[in-house]
Amino acid sequence: MSASLSRAAAALLRWGRSAGGGGLPGAGVRAASSGGQAEQLDALVKKDKVVVFLKGTPEQPQCGFSNAVVQILRLHGVRDYAAYNVLDDPELRQGIKDYSNWPTIPQVYLNGEFVGGCDILLQMHQNGDLVEELKKLGIRSALVDEKDQDSK
């Protein structure tokens, strides 16, 4: 898995993003795995405030659900996040599913905690919870700025 994570990190750097930051423990259930895979994934999801595992890249999502997650983050003005393309690495793709005990991709983590996939992020966007969660991370949603402009 170490080589897999190296490829994922290299892909992340190719996207022009440097990883940094910290986080709280993830809420997902971890499956026992060999070679410290869970520990390596734990480090990945905690490395940045917002981490997304998707099919493709933010610039070129390869499935509608991954595209929806990217678009929701863009609507909120979230541009600084770590994105890992699971299509580049089958071990990473299966490993993150085992790590979170969630069967599908994309997967979104906020401050090291597993949030869910596209459907949950969309629901959080629609009911306003995403604005609040981003605020807890010190990220001001662009939608709040837009509302402020409209009220003036």
Curated annotation (Swiss-Prot):
The modification N6-succinyllysine is found at residue 55. Gene3D superfamilies: Glutaredoxin. Pfam families: Glutaredoxin. Glutathione binds at residues 55, 93-97, 105, 118-119. It is found in: Mitochondrion matrix. [2Fe-2S] cluster binds at residue 63. GO terms for molecular function: 2 iron, 2 sulfur cluster binding; metal ion binding. Keywords: 2Fe-2S, Iron, Iron-sulfur, Metal-binding, Mitochondrion, Phosphoprotein, Redox-active center, Transit peptide. Belongs to the glutaredoxin family. Monothiol subfamily. This is Glutaredoxin-related protein 5, mitochondrial.
